[in-house]
Amino acid sequence: QIEEQAGGDKAKIAEIMLGIVEKQGKHRNPVTGSGGMLLGTVEKIGDALVGKTDLKVGDKIATLVSLSLTPLRIDKIKEIRADVDQVDIDGKAILFESGIYAKIPADLPEKLALSALDVAGAPAQTAKLVKPGDTVLIIGAGGKSGMLCCYEAKKRAGVTGKVIGLCHSQRSTERLQKLGFCDYVFSADATQPVPVMEKIAELTNGEMCDITINNVNITDTEMTSILCTKNDGLVYFFSMATSFTKAALGAEGVGSDVTMIVGNGYTKGHAEITLQELRESEALRKIFTELYA
């Protein structure tokens, strides 16, 4: 969003980011309400926490709480890598005792780990929700969280299950097909519920999906998620663009008794589950390194 607002101008991106932090004391995007996460080195541990945490000064960690609520000071913006949504800065942040974090593992490059940890909640929730034999639809399957969810969904659904990936562009469709995590991959506009519903009906012989996981960060995809899911199925909205009103009234309007879950960026063990995916799948690790690290 900031890149779009700045017209791709890196100096303008830096100016917007510095302005946000200067005004709010944290990096909370006033348009989206979200903020990202950070990778940093522990400089000091509060006296009351010394000996009660597994951290020590000098440890490299990724914070798993949003920068929208992390006290932050930016002294200097050193490099902006808009293609991978990462910014290098000199600065300081405060992580509270309740703030969750992950130590950067020795066996994975920092930027690779950071790119996956940024969306760790989605694949970990997928691991919790998907059962053997489930038919699962991933909307936004070609993106960062989408690819991780596809891998995890296939792992959990097993040979008796079915994973369907819905991508936006032809490029992301081809990329996901090559990865081989999905039984079916197709390209469609997720804001158009009826054509997508018809395609899912065709792929599932009219049975529809047990679980739909929505990773698309655009508005108006609520009805697509609901209509593609069985009446007693489950929709997981990981997308920050989800409208409670559209989802609730939409399901009511079409007489769907679907269970809807608001995506929580945290679930127990989410960092470990997500990093383990990169260790297990060479194809996933390779594509994440190429695209995001």
Language model features with spans:
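Short, well-ordered loop/turn sites that connect or cap secondary structure elements
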Residues: 49-57, 130, 229
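Conserved N-terminal Rossmann-fold NAD(P)-binding element of oxidoreductases
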Residues: 136-142
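Adenosine-nucleotide cofactor-binding segment
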Residues: 154-220
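C-terminal capping/lid region of NAD(P)-dependent oxidoreductase domains
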Residues: 206, 276-293
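Glycine-rich phosphate-binding loop and adjacent beta-alpha segment
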Residues: 216-281
